[in-house]
Curated annotation (Swiss-Prot):
Keyword Amino-acid biosynthesis: no
Protein name (database record): Dihydromonapterin reductase
UniProt function note: Catalyzes the reduction of dihydromonapterin to tetrahydromonapterin. Also has lower activity with dihydrofolate.
Catalytic activity entry: (6S)-5,6,7,8-tetrahydrofolate + NADP(+) = 7,8-dihydrofolate + NADPH + H(+); 7,8-dihydromonapterin + NADPH + H(+) = 5,6,7,8-tetrahydromonapterin + NADP(+)
Activity vs pH: Optimum pH is 4.7.
Gene: folM
Organism: Escherichia coli (strain K12)
InterPro entries from the UniProt entry: NAD(P)-bd_dom_sf, Sc_DH/Rdtase_CS, SDR_fam
Length: 240
């Protein structure tokens, strides 16, 4: 008899940075992946050529979220995990209507994972005890707050709370946890002064890169016991 094909891992926002690194990590492990992307970066073509299923999605509306869910439901009979990595970053600033800023942040960080978790629940169930996972990517600011990104921080805090609610709802078949990173890697355009200021905010004074996230994701996927928890990746920043 042939070997059973592993169930795919769904990664939202998989076209760049941490989402892209996670997608390649699983591909290199011969783990099928489904990736959502908003903008067709060149990296998407690389994922497709490597065998990933890449679905363009517009999470700015609930209809867009549900259209993406329908595509996933049509493409697979089950999921190994959902990694909610899709994110947006908006600040309260002159000219930006405050209600629009809040609505945008809540849409991507709360409505989207909320709707997808419900819509795809049946794909996660039925595979055994602690056999499936949901991982929410939140943020360090959930703990501290942010005077410049109030809506962003509030939306990530709501996602953090949903981690515990969905853990209660889906146990013991599905484990639900969150990862709360601070600085993981820089953008290419970040100058030396900014980089040093950012590094000085943590005790470890380094940007560890995607591998730190990948290692934690691997731990959560292999655990058969951990659920309903948030895991900070902040280099001791809370102690500064």
């Amino acid at each position: 008899m042939g070997k059973t094909q592993p169930l795919p891992i769904l990664i939202t926002g998989g076209g760049r940075r941490i989402g892209l690194a996670l997608a390649w990590h699983f591909i290199n492990q011969k783990q099928p992946v489904i990736v959502s992307y908003r903008t067709h970066y060149p990296a998407i073509d690389g994922l497709i050529n490597a065998g990933a299923q890449c679905i363009q999605a517009d999470f700015s509306t609930n209809d867009g979220v549900m259209a993406f869910a329908d595509e996933v439901l049509k493409s697979t009979h089950g999921l190994r995990a959902i990694l909610h990595n899709a994110s947006a970053w908006m600040a309260e600033k002159p000219g930006a209507p405050l209600a629009d800023v809040l609505a945008c942040m809540m849409q991507i960080h709360v409505n989207t994972p909320y709707l997808l978790n419900h819509a795809l629940e049946r794909l996660l169930r039925g595979h055994g005890h602690a056999a499936s996972d949901i991982i929410h990517f939140t943020d360090y600011v959930v703990e501290r707050g942010s005077d410049k990104h109030i809506a962003y921080a509030a939306s990530k805090a709501a996602l953090d709370n949903m981690t515990r609610s969905f853990a209660r709802k889906l146990a013991p078949e599905v484990k639900v946890n969150s990862i709360a990173p601070s600085l993981i890697l820089f953008n290419e355009h970040d100058d030396a002064e900014y980089r040093q200021q950012a590094l000085n905010k943590s005790l470890m004074k380094t940007a560890p890169g995607e591998k730190e996230v990948i290692d934690l994701v691997d731990y959560l996927l292999t655990s058969c016991f951990v659920t309903g928890r948030s895991f900070p990746l902040d280099g001791g920043r809370h102690l500064r």
